Amino acid sequence: MRILVTGATGFVGRTLCAVLAESGYQVRAAVRVDSRLADHMSERVVVGDIGPGTSWDAALRDVDGVVHLAARAHVLNDAPDNTRLYFETNQHGTEALARAAARAGVRRFLFLSSVKVNGEDSMTGAYGAADEPHPQDAYGKSKWLAEQAVRAVAGQSGMQAVIVRPPLVYGPGVRANFLRLMRWVDARRPLPLAAIDNRRSLVSVWTLCDLLATLLEHPAAPGTWMVSDGEDLSTPDLIRRIGRAMGRPVRLVAAPLGLLGVLGGILGKKAEVARLCGSLVVDSAPTRTKLGWSPPLSVDEAMHRTVAWYLSEGRPRDS
């Protein structure tokens, strides 16, 4: 089978292309600009920026399945002027690709959405695939509209639609709070986060890509799926796991949560602090039971792999 992967050179795309190639698929990598690709990306097609006017004809020729990863990524505190770009890329660009794929006779279309379609916190219980969506920002709203567009195209054409909503994805190349936590642990800084009593679902890039590969041919795949490593961690637990994988002592001290919120506001990091303190849990049990699938790695195994990348490539240059 020939599979078109958009966002093939991105954080998730690099790992997915390798997983698919190792599984015997012919991988066609859709890239924004011409660049040197890894050996397992046997075919490449340059599509430019993704939007409603992107031409997909060459990319979709003789393709059996599509995995659409490319998106305008969520950016904390993004400028208001950039809001339209989320909808142009994530909503309208996805719809245009789905319509082109249906015209080209693609059998199955996998769309990587986001748990942000469900909401920003799960204080009342774990998010499930059937829950009513409550996206809060432009990124989440654009992903929700894209999901609806993909389902509509599938309903009109017979193409099978598969949607996956991951929580925070970590692995080689991870950024934002996860990278920041690794750097703090590496620097042996005391962290005032011991009083945080939350739960957050995570998924390693290897587990996510294993699920995506499974969904390409599984007969029960059409539908919407939540995914996680299967073990939800508090922020202090996550820091301890990072420290264990890094071989570093972890220094956690308790600070009032209200004080953390005030400091976050003063430093312009309110959203980052909210994520460190808040809970966001997904119910991935139906994914495991209905598909007969399980994560290929434990949290600790994935953490060790991620830390190994950080120690070799992710550290600040002056470390």
Locations of the language-model features?
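Conserved Rossmann-fold NAD(P)-dependent oxidoreductase catalytic core, especially the SDR/UDP-sugar
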Residues: 95-138
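Mid/C-terminal beta-alpha module of Rossmann-like enzyme folds, strongest
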Residues: 215-270, 300, 304-307, 315-318
